Amino acid sequence: MDYLKHIDQQWLLAINGWHSEWADMLMWYISKSTTWLPLYALLVGLIVYRFGILSPSLCREGRRGSSLLRVLIILAGFAVAVGVSDFVSSGIIKPWVCRLRPTHEPALAGMLHLVNGYTGGLYGFVSSHAANTMACALLFALLYRNKYATAGLMLWVALNCYSRMYLGVHYPADIIGGLAIGALMATLTYGMVRRLVDRVDERSEGVGASCRWPEGDEDYPTADS
């Protein structure tokens, strides 16, 4: 266990030790949730388009009667996935494990490069940033099933995770734990959302009218369709 902790610290120091003024500014803004508000708006818009009344191929025989409720269920699913991930990571695991953040670890005093004096809260295991971004990204990937969107969102998750280590507020193990929680919540929420949406569609349009869920990129309209 001590060896693993040592490796964890060494990886953190290596990441945090590579710094510059421009990287400080970049990682600071990557780590801020408000930086990504336009991305969140884009994701909502894509959900509305793909699963709402504007979708050209959502339900069999053009049935779109339950489009509003369908979209609301999916958006509520995102709120549940991210909200539960945040609660589990920050409200349960951090105060239970009580692992100090690197910035509050006496053994690392004076060894970390701090950006804008930022040290974060007292405990760091697991990373809420990692959990929340993974929950959002994976749930969208499971719903939308587009390889380009999935790749872009996974890059977004990776940047957020790297920024937390660059800022010195999380060990790599904190990040890995957060990613696992976010992935679990996204997977569970995806199954729940699918069942609810199918039930709503069947009640609205009759048996056999359930949503045709995308299975891959071929399910999306192209310029030739």
Q: Which residue ranges define each predicted feature?
A:
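N-terminal transmembrane-helix/juxtamembrane module of multi-pass inner/ER membrane proteins
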Residues: 1-40, 58-59, 89-120, 211-212, ...
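Membrane helix-loop-helix hairpins that form the core translocation module of multi-pass transporters
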Residues: 78-91, 95-100, 176, 182
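Interfacial segments of alpha-helical transmembrane regions
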Residues: 44-89, 150
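Membrane-interface elements of multi-pass transporters and channels
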Residues: 18, 22, 49-54, 91, ...
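Membrane-embedded catalytic cores of phosphoryl/pyrophosphoryl-handling enzymes
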Residues: 113-225
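Alpha-helical membrane-inserting segments
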Residues: 43, 84-93, 185-196
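Hydrophobic, aromatic-rich transmembrane alpha-helices
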Residues: 39-52, 133-141
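Alpha-helical transmembrane segments of integral membrane proteins
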Residues: 29, 37, 73, 77, ...
